[in-house]
Amino acid sequence: MKLVNIWLLLLVVLLCGKKHLGDRLGKKAFEKAPCPSCSHLTLKVEFSSTVVEYEYIVAFNGYFTAKARNSFISSALKSSEVDNWRIIPRNNPSSDYPSDFEVIQIKEKQKAGLLTLEDHPNIKRVTPQRKVFRSLKFAESDPIVPCNETRWSQKWQSSRPLKRASLSLGSGFWHATGRHSSRRLLRAIPRQVAQTLQADVLWQMGYTGANVRVAVFDTGLSEKHPHFKNVKERTNWTNERTLDDGLGHGTFVAGVIASMRECQGFAPDAELHIFRVFTNNQVSYTSWFLDAFNYAILKKIDVLNLSIGGPDFMDHPFVDKVWELTANNVIMVSAIGNDGPLYGTLNNPADQMDVIGVGGIDFEDNIARFSSRGMTTWELPGGYGRVKPDIVTYGAGVRGSGVKGGCRALSGTSVASPVVAGAVTLLVSTVQKRELVNPASVKQALIASARRLPGVNMFEQGHGKLDLLRAYQILSSYKPQASLSPSYIDLTECPYMWPYCSQPIYYGGMPTIVNVTILNGMGVTGRIVDKPEWRPYLPQNGDNIEVAFSYSSVLWPWSGYLAISISVTKKAASWEGIAQGHIMITVASPAETELKNGAEHTSTVKLPIKVKIIPTPPRSKRVLWDQYHNLRYPPGYFPRDNLRMKNDPLDWNGDHVHTNFRDMYQHLRSMGYFVEVLGAPFTCFDATQYGTLLMVDSEEEYFPEEIAKLRRDVDNGLSLVVFSDWYNTSVMRKVKFYDENTRQWWMPDTGGANVPALNELLSVWNMGFSDGLYEGEFALANHDMYYASGCSIARFPEDGVVITQTFKDQGLEVLKQETAVVDNVPILGLYQIPAEGGGRIVLYGDSNCLDDSHRQKDCFWLLDALLQYTSYGVTPPSLSHSGNRQRPPSGAGLAPPERMEGNHLHRYSKVLEAHLGDPKPRPLPACPHLSWAKPQPLNETAPSNLWKHQKLLSIDLDKVVLPNFRSNRPQVRPLSPGESGAWDIPGGIMPGRYNQEVGQTIPVFAFLGAMVALAFFVVQISKAKSRPKRRRPRAKRPQLAQQAHPARTPSV
């Protein structure tokens, strides 16, 4: 009987302990297991950067020894009579190698020494040194669930306040997936991300990341961490004398990539190169990154994970060095940012063409709320942004290594980035011909294999969700070639092709610009042969559209752009229908072995185009958005429009109708308006085509020719709607940045809007805004409204309509911390030009109610009412009968706001030029002129389905078969190119792919069932042996055995 009890006890222990057996390995340092509520943490990552006073990065045209660099700088500064300068020593592993930059400290006020340095023939550029701050804070995903465990209770503090400033991965994860209903499901089932993406299939084939060098740029790693067996090198690039990770973020990232136990990474046998680039106080410098990047090139790193980023895509030393890294065959993977769900919030370097930018999803395949959205804003105002992120993967509730062992779960795109980096490392180890692996070929494989998520547009998901096995199939038979991203243009496909699909095109409209990225897997450099060719399909009315091209003269590194402008021909002005055609481009790259005959590799790519054309809408329904006069960070300090939002000090989202004014655009489209974007001066549009010019949050100055033309346009029937923002020089001085460490001031270049410039534009109609700054809630026409840091109307014609409200004086609050209420603040004015056929003008003092960035209450209804007024001359009854109508202010006795003395707007303005004294306008630039491509018509039928799952041209998936291996997992069947399977269905299941959770659950249930059956068998036998013998027929004993084993035939 004792033996039976021991057996039962062992079974119970076995059954209860099996689940946690793996999790206990390597946890001897901890006495207590983590409590359940500690298993999922939200990681708040916030960045800020400042310019270090008197310190500059001197970039050279090549790599030189320290002695040569010193000689160049000394000779350059001799003639400038600057004596107070020195080269700042950099003690790190790259000090013994030649470098392409130097950090100097030069104290001068006139900048003569800097100008002299830039004139030296061996010096490429001189830029300020930047100090980067990162703040990490780990918080519970669900604050309702208590946690008594002390292991993860530490709150990480930065040397600076927790806020997002100039360089940022986001505003933190206050809006992370922990607030989603689906997020709570993840608590019960901790996910192993590597197995979820089926990395174990490749492991069992013998691929584990061996012989692949992967670099982790983060907070370091402890020397004897139990999760890692192949840490090749740890280097420190900070001013602290330690290589260990004092925070845990670097350990987590490394674990997702290469942990070998517990929370397994993707490539446990990869060579880990740990670059410690952040101190325990989360401080770093641009020069630390540059030195570390140079060392990564020297070490021939294959894959580099960079879970940092920020909006400053004009930080030239950093951007240039990233280009150099990828040109040296380093595959860089970077987080796209944590500023979602707002659009136009992509972070650098993930927004670069040569970098794999990664967004985040949860385990239910929903786009994570925190994941930043496209488009890129580099190209504004004259162009249009590119598609980013490239792909998305799991970034919510991902498990990774703890700082001393064990596992924890974190969320963020800084978590999704190492998921892709680990997957790429594993993929690279599967490629037999390593010479075919480069940043372009890997990116081509990832985006061509990605599984598209249903109901999500391309600026949220890029090309779709990472599919590891499909990417393996593509890479295993890859041949060097060029490809396009996106691979087709279908302006009728919603929602994936939003915003293009949201509005048809028509004759007379601004050309629709599609920015396509060219990926060149044939070589680091390339070119487009001849010119792209436009081939319209005549049966599909392709001759009703015309296209123009702008493209990179050189494709470097590994990539370039192809901007396509699409317009409607005059003959289709009254036509409605679908038009199709395609573009052919040929890309050439030099052969790897340069032959005397100059042989090149070439690849020809076809880009299908499909558009919907409608008759030109009436003038009253056409709204023109002024993009040309919107400025943003980078490069200048343009402050936020709502001064209450102290954690977001910069206006950096592009102020475009497809970024932070997306909701307003969607509303206007739903109301039947057609919105076009003007990326050129006012002299470059035909005002007779449009009913209303919409100017919102304008920071730019105006050319004199623009002012004169706009006056003529309004007199001839164009209407003008202006949404302004605050402008007060005293407040601007108050909101400037001061960094205690660097003693550096950041002074705003303008206010929320450039009110002095707007007043010059409006002065011809006796209108203008004041420098008052007001805030408050109010009701207008039975609508609740909020005035967020707006200005008031200072002057308005007497025969106009003016609406007033009672507000708090926010300017007084900011300057003196005093509270005052001001009555009859004029905020809205409506005016009809008295001349026959004249237009109408509307002024409103606040744009925050239209802006998605920090909008509290929208005013879309008001915009509707104002457009009804400007388009049809109908004054809304809700405004004409308002009890808040007052006599228009005359502006008597009020001095108009003046530009702040000493501002640097001319540095970033397209209108002003640098000049001593008052700034002067530049010469008026010529209007953009498009050269339409000569069509080469095709008398053939266009393909019916432009998007099949993206295929690289040289790959025949019929021949791609996963090798056999011993496994209970079903064989993954390759999909043939012509097969109509789930690959062509958004959100479909892979052919031959089974449900991962079910696959992992079946062996557990089988084991439990076997144990229960065994226990039952032992108990029954024990009872039978210990029971007193009774007289009964021997024939019944087999029946007892049959009851115990109904599936067996008992033996007598």
Swiss-Prot record:
Regulation: Inhibited by divalent copper and zinc ions, but not by nickel or cobalt. Inhibited by its prosegment, but not smaller fragments. Inhibited by 4-(2-aminoethyl)benzenesulfonyl fluoride (AEBSF), a serine protease inhibitor.
Ranges of Polar residues composition bias in the record: 877-887
Primary location recorded for the protein, binned into one broad class: endoplasmic reticulum
Cofactor(s) recorded in Swiss-Prot or TrEMBL: Ca(2+)
Subcellular location: Endoplasmic reticulum membrane; Golgi apparatus membrane
Endpoints of the signal sequence: 1-17
An annotated Gene Ontology molecular function: serine-type endopeptidase activity
Keyword Lipid metabolism: yes
Family: Belongs to the peptidase S8 family.
Protein name (Swiss-Prot/TrEMBL): Membrane-bound transcription factor site-1 protease
UniProt organism field: Rattus norvegicus (Rat)
